[in-house]
């Protein structure tokens, strides 16, 4: 166990809560102390839902530990069933309650209810949130479909109907899942493919029973749905797709794979380059500015892998770092990083990720909410591509990541920080020209240039002071800092570190303009 300020994933019962809250007519009884009820805020504050999660907490206290906590659990289970009348009941325990070993799932099954009861055994001290969500979804599907017949059914061609697919994996607190589902439904409809069930998002236990009516399962989020898709293929003979449609190339590959599995002819429109604005821009002269930009990528496995492909193949970026916090996806991320000449960063320590960002000196960071803060401290543009996220990454507007429109959104989210960074750098370069003299009139009208000079100096001073000066460190002179401020902000930190290292090696106590250029010549030699 380690003490940390931030964590990429919560304990596995948070993953179970995500599944329960995503579904309808389902209730989750969680054996947990009062302090574990904080999880409600994740859905009401970040996801901005208008209702509480369908979760009943036993909320035991210290004084209850001296009595029969099993009776406390049974009382809450009965109250939840009588009050909410769910079609199925999930029963589990939090990391704290796991230590008591009351086994609430076994207690619930012995109470004689006539609804399916899914007992969740989630090892809180060895697994995390995404695994908990995956295991919960798997147990729900397995429990409800375990008695389903394995007899082969007629194909969609024999039944003379349109092909049907299930979209599996989207959940609440997933990255743009709501909009991804709408985009993929729209995309499949254009090719004559119907959606049978979307699960767990918006599905009820009755919908889970309809999963076998589909011809193919589409695994949209492997972290949540892959184990379920594998079980459905083995036990119910329902094949599933493995390509996640994130980006133009991946969307094309996804459609080709799906058509092949369904034994449909692949239409020529799949390969048309005008499906997304990203392709048009990548072929335009304006995109030359972006070619070769250094990008660092970190997030959940699905989005990190997709981002690496988009950056490398579709936007012409140079990927200088690739990693994930999801150990379940590490097996897929490592070969992808190796193909780019990198060593994958597999860690759940955000400070280790920040150190890797410093070391690689990227011009753009694609990561989570944590990397946004790290990039801000380092003065590097950043776009959030993965959970964990904050409320600003759950837009009220339609903003998918998958499909053609998702590629457009990705293009905007990634390119705009770089373009605004260019504008900031140009202003920094030419701020001494007569058009930028502080006394001149500005767009602020009567305020003119008052206060601009001090603000600019403070901003430069803040950007420059990104390391703590110790007794052995060389000191920057005013001329040296002034010259350093002319260097683009996205490489300024690297130049500063290299110059300081050179000054230490050369025995310089002060870094002036001449030292800066000597260091430049030294590292270029």
From Swiss-Prot:
Disulfide-bonded cysteines: none
Catalytic residues identified in the record: 286 (proton donor)
Record GO terms (molecular function): 4 iron, 4 sulfur cluster binding; ATP binding; metal ion binding; oxidoreductase activity, acting on iron-sulfur proteins as donors; oxidoreductase activity, acting on the CH-CH group of donors, iron-sulfur protein as acceptor
E.C. number(s) listed in UniProt: 1.3.7.7
Residue sites binding substrate per the record: 421-422
InterPro entries: ChlB/BchB/BchZ, LI-POR_suB-like_C, Nase/OxRdtase_comp1, P-CP_red_C, Protochl_reductB, Protochlorophyllide_Rdtase
Cofactor(s) needed by this chain: [4Fe-4S] cluster
Record's cofactor remark: Binds 1 [4Fe-4S] cluster per heterodimer. The cluster is bound at the heterodimer interface by residues from both subunits.
Binding locations of [4Fe-4S] cluster: 36
Catalytic activity: chlorophyllide a + oxidized 2[4Fe-4S]-[ferredoxin] + 2 ADP + 2 phosphate = protochlorophyllide a + reduced 2[4Fe-4S]-[ferredoxin] + 2 ATP + 2 H2O
GO biological process terms on file: light-independent chlorophyll biosynthetic process; photosynthesis, dark reaction
Gene3D superfamilies referenced in this protein's UniProt entry, alphabetically: 1.20.89.20, Nitrogenase molybdenum iron protein domain, Proto-chlorophyllide reductase 57 kD subunit B
Top-level enzyme category: oxidoreductase
Keywords, alphabetical: 4Fe-4S, ATP-binding, Chlorophyll biosynthesis, Iron, Iron-sulfur, Metal-binding, Nucleotide-binding, Oxidoreductase, Photosynthesis
One protein family per Pfam: PCP_red
Coiled coil: none
Subunit text: Protochlorophyllide reductase is composed of three subunits; ChlL, ChlN and ChlB. Forms a heterotetramer of two ChlB and two ChlN subunits.
Similarity remark: Belongs to the ChlB/BchB/BchZ family.
Protein function: Component of the dark-operative protochlorophyllide reductase (DPOR) that uses Mg-ATP and reduced ferredoxin to reduce ring D of protochlorophyllide (Pchlide) to form chlorophyllide a (Chlide). This reaction is light-independent. The NB-protein (ChlN-ChlB) is the catalytic component of the complex.
Protein name: Light-independent protochlorophyllide reductase subunit B
Protein source organism: Prochlorococcus marinus (strain NATL1A)
Lineage: Bacteria, Bacillati, Cyanobacteriota, Cyanophyceae, Synechococcales
């Amino acid at each position: 166990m380690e003490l940390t300020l931030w964590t990429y994933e919560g304990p596995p019962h948070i993953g179970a809560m995500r599944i329960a809250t995503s579904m309808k007519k389902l209730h989750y009884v969680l054996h947990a102390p009062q302090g574990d009820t904080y999880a409600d805020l994740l859905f009401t504050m970040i996801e901005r839902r208008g209702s509480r999660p369908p979760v009943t907490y036993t909320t035991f206290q210290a004084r209850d530990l001296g009595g029969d906590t099993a009776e406390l659990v049974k009382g809450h289970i009965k109250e939840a069933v009588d009050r909410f009348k769910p079609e199925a009941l999930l029963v589990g325990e939090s990391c704290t309650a796991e230590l008591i070993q009351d086994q609430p799932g076994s207690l619930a099954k012995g109470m004689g209810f006539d609804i399916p009861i899914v007992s969740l055994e989630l090892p809180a001290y060895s697994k995390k949130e995404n695994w908990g969500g995956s295991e919960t979804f798997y147990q729900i599907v397995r429990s409800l479909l375990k008695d389903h017949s394995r007899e082969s059914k007629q194909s969609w061609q024999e039944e003379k109907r349109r092909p049907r697919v299930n979209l599996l994996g989207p959940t609440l607190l997933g990255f743009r899942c709501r909009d991804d589902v709408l985009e993929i439904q729209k995309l499949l409809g254009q090719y004559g493919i119907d959606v049978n069930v979307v699960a767990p998002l918006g599905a009820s236990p009755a919908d889970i029973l309809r999963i076998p009516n589909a011809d193919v399962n589409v695994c949209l989020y492997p972290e949540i749905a892959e184990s379920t898709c594998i079980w459905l293929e083995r036990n119910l003979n329902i094949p599933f797709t493995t390509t996640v449609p994130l980006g133009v190339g991946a969307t094309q590959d996804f459609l080709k794979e799906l058509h092949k599995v369904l034994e449909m002819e692949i239409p020529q429109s799949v390969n048309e380059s005008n499906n997304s604005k990203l392709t048009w821009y990548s072929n335009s002269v304006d995109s030359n500015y972006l070619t070769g930009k250094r990008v660092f990528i970190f997030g959940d496995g699905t989005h990190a892998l997709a981002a690496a492909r988009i950056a490398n193949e579709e936007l012409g970026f140079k990927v200088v770092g690739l990693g994930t916090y999801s150990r379940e996806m590490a097996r897929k991320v490592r070969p992808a990083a190796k193909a780019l000449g990198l060593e994958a960063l597999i860690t759940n320590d955000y400070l280790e990720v920040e150190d890797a960002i410093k070391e690689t000196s990227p011009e753009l960071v694609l990561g989570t909410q944590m990397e946004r803060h790290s990039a801000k401290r380092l003065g590097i543009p950043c776009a959030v591509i993965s959970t964990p996220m904050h409320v600003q990454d759950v837009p009220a507007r339609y903003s998918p990541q998958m499909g053609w429109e998702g590629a457009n959104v990705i293009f905007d989210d990634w390119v705009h920080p770089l373009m605004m960074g260019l504008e900031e750098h140009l202003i920094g370069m030419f701020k001494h020209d007569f058009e930028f003299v502080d006394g001149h009139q500005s767009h602020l009208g009567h305020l003119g240039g008052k206060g601009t000079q001090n603000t600019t100096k403070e901003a430069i001073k803040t950007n420059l002071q990104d390391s703590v000066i110790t007794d052995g460190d060389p000191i920057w002179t005013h001329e040296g800092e002034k010259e350093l401020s002319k260097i683009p902000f996205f490489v300024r930190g690297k130049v500063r570190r290299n110059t300081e290292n050179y000054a230490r090696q050369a025995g310089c106590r002060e870094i002036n303009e001449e030292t800066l250029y000597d260091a430049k010549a030294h590292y270029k030699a």
